[in-house]
């Protein structure tokens, strides 16, 4: 049998086998979905930002503020800070570390990164010292993890959280950020 006829025969046989035995391409459809469970809302008090250069701002988190949820209540204690980097796209990338002291006296160390995509309106409100909300922004989501020695809150060492921005204000008299926090299941 000439080589070209053998090649055609093998190709035909392979094609028939694939069709007969039900070969299909891998599916690209979604196979799972994260579930979010509300954990708490918190308001962190902030000092005005220190501008290092056009791409880096540092914000100290002040003592006080609050965190409240169905099974948690507490306030922020020092140390705490937020390093904001302006990316080439104009988006802000957060790098945050804060300490939360619960009403039971337990310490929770939160660290998170995230992305802020401002609009002209949100930047104008921020510059004017006005409150801006999630409706003013294109995108503002962060992903905290928590470390603690607390028995009550030990489960937080084993879960990923998501912060969804609620509102903020940046002024000399009243600077804060507020988030709703969810456990990803």
Identify the residue ranges that each predicted region occupies.
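Sec/Tat signal peptide C-region and signal peptidase I cleavage site
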Residues: 25-29
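Bacterial N-terminal signal peptides
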Residues: 12-23
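Beta-strand-enriched cores of mature, soluble protein domains
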Residues: 30-185
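Bacterial N-terminal signal peptides that target proteins for export
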Residues: 1-13
């Amino acid at each position: 049998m000439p080589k070209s006829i053998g090649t055609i025969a093998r190709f035909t046989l392979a094609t028939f086998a694939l069709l007969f035995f039900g070969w299909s391409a891998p599916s690209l459809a979604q196979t799972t979905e994260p579930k979010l469970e509300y954990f708490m809302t918190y308001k962190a008090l902030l000092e005005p930002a220190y501008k290092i250069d056009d791409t880096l701002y540092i914000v100290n988190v002040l003592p006080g503020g609050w965190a409240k949820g169905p099974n948690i209540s507490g306030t922020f204690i020092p140390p705490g800070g937020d390093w904001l980097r302006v990316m080439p796209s104009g988006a802000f990338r957060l790098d945050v570390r804060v300490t939360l002291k619960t009403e039971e006296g337990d310490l929770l160390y939160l660290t998170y990164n995230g992305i802020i995509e401002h609009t002209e309106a949100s930047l104008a409100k921020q510059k004017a010292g006005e409150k801006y909300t999630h409706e003013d922004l294109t995108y503002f989501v962060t992903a905290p993890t928590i470390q603690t020695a607390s028995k009550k809150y030990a489960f937080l060492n084993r879960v990923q959280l998501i912060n969804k921005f609620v509102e903020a204000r940046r002024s000399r008299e009243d600077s804060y950020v507020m988030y709703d926090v969810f456990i990803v299941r």
